[in-house]
Amino acid sequence: MSRVVLAYSGGLDTSVCIELLRERYGYDEVITVTADVGQPEEELREAEEKARKLADEHFTVDCVDEFVCEYCWRAVKANATYEGYPLSTALARPLIAQKVLEVARDVDADAVAHGCTGKGNDQFRFESYLRAHGGEEFEIVAPVRDLNLTRDEEIAYAEERGIPVPVDVDSPYSVDENLWGRSIEGGVLEDPSEEPPEEVFEWTVSPAEAPDEPEVVEIEFEDGVPVEVDGRDDPVEIVRYLNETAGEHGVGRIDIIEDRVIGLKSREVYEAPAAVTLLEAHRALEAFTLTRRELSLKASLEEEWARLVYDGLWFNPLREHLEAFFDSTQRHVEGTVRVKLFKGSATVISRESPRALYEEELISYEEKQFDQRTAEGAVKLHGLQERLALRRRG
């Protein structure tokens, strides 16, 4: 008996994949796996109910704590964004792929499958991990891509077979959610000249409709990661709280043109209130506690880390080398940052740290502890190479 394990979200793509794997690929059993990485409880419940009707067996794997502590907190240390996007979907994919492989081994499956299209990034993220960690054990199947299905064709296929799906031709948005962020694609969003309609947003209010009074949150960091926010010290609760609180003030909306792995440019809309707030606070604390050269080198390495994750290369050895450097710097990133949330902005208004490299007595114009006359020699030498180049090169 042939058996395939499908990474299952409950959305259109993965729902039609269940029947396609039987009908077009001939698998006798289709087993679905949903990884809980912080999706809304209602979404998880609906996915599980649907999977139990459509699939032969279903597993929901709780990995939200692991997602925050082992993935999101690494992203905070790396100040990770790709072209302005905090990598929410990209961060979750290797963890989901790992859980799919674990179930596939437990049930003695012949193959693993995903519902990614041939135009998106997730096919790279899932398959690179699956091939690296299970390519010799399992066949990898991608029905939507391999059958070259359009979204309208998937909707029609679902309607013909009575497969319940959360979209139709009048509301064709594709949404992916985890605790670190929410991504929205499709429909009118594919026209970059059109403003995203308010109906696509769920986590954030319109900045114009946000409260007229700002709210300040206090974030405490140790070793570069948040350990307490307004009295909350559980990692998952910290992210949930900031998603709710910052979202109420319109913080975290992102609308960008993004360069996909495959080479296409796409219009992407995201909501990431907690990620945006935490990254803003973390950068401010780093500027307070790290040297200029540490910050400069780290900025270039952060870009490389983010690109690895975005491209689906979580398992690349370079990521671990980069994180070794990040971890070394983060030993000094300790302190408290206060962030004001107001009508779409998250603004750092204060920072305190026992490891601060800021010395008020030295920088103050009212103090004489720093002898200004000692700067004369440095000023004379500053730009020496540039002056020589100007003379000798004309």
Curated annotation (Swiss-Prot):
It is found in: Cytoplasm. GO terms for cellular component: cytoplasm. Its EC number is 6.3.4.5. InterPro entries: Arginosuc_syn_C, Arginosuc_syn_N, Arginosuc_synth, Arginosuc_synth_CS, Arginosuc_synth_type_1_subfam, AS_cat/multimer_dom_body, Rossmann-like_a/b/a_fold. The keyword Nucleotide-binding applies. It catalyses: L-citrulline + L-aspartate + ATP = 2-(N(omega)-L-arginino)succinate + AMP + diphosphate + H(+). It is an enzyme of class 6 (ligase). GO terms for molecular function: argininosuccinate synthase activity; ATP binding. The keyword Ligase applies. Pathway: Amino-acid biosynthesis; L-arginine biosynthesis; L-arginine from L-ornithine and carbamoyl phosphate: step 2/3. L-aspartate binds at residues 117, 121-122. L-citrulline binds at residues 85, 121, 125, 174, 183, 258, 270. Pfam families: Arginosuc_syn_C, Arginosuc_synth. Keywords: Amino-acid biosynthesis, Arginine biosynthesis, ATP-binding, Cytoplasm, Ligase, Nucleotide-binding. One of its GO terms (biological process) is urea cycle. ATP binds at residues 7-15, 35, 115. Homotetramer. Belongs to the argininosuccinate synthase family. Type 1 subfamily. This is Argininosuccinate synthase. The gene is argG.
